[in-house]
Amino acid sequence: MSRRNRAPKRDILPDPKYKSQVVAKFVNHIMLSGKKSIAEKIVYGAFDKIKAKDASANEVEVFEKALESVSPMVEVKSRRVGGATYQVPVEVRPERRQTLGMRWIIDAARKRKENTMGDRVAAEILEAVEGRGAAVKKREDTHKMAEANKAFAHFRW
């Protein structure tokens, strides 16, 4: 770990189509090997499919609702105390909540069986809004783990 000062947070420019920073972050998370135009096609294609499913809904609001239903409130962190390693439940900061939610939606989408990545992302977002899907299950598992280790909550740092 660097002993220098922490690098300053960079502001992310909102995406060109929806003017949303959250969507821009999602595009950046989907991007592989610096291919942003492909990542944008995937995300915008997924949003078009969401819009096609429910014409009255705003696709960005649907995405934000899905992100909210996937983002964890608590997680466990390992802490060594006297030779034993405890899984200590800690509250998740808002920025990390958003990042974890996006990461879990993308991981779940990559494991799905639909043809294109756009289809997978759209299906995972729609399932997350309904409270189903692999990303929501990941959140439930994280919360269960934190609940099971609640006894070690006094080991906070």
UniProtKB/Swiss-Prot annotation:
GO terms for cellular component: small ribosomal subunit. GO terms for molecular function: rRNA binding; structural constituent of ribosome; tRNA binding. GO terms for biological process: translation. Part of the 30S ribosomal subunit. Contacts proteins S9 and S11. Belongs to the universal ribosomal protein uS7 family. One of the primary rRNA binding proteins, it binds directly to 16S rRNA where it nucleates assembly of the head domain of the 30S subunit. Is located at the subunit interface close to the decoding center, probably blocks exit of the E-site tRNA. This is Small ribosomal subunit protein uS7.
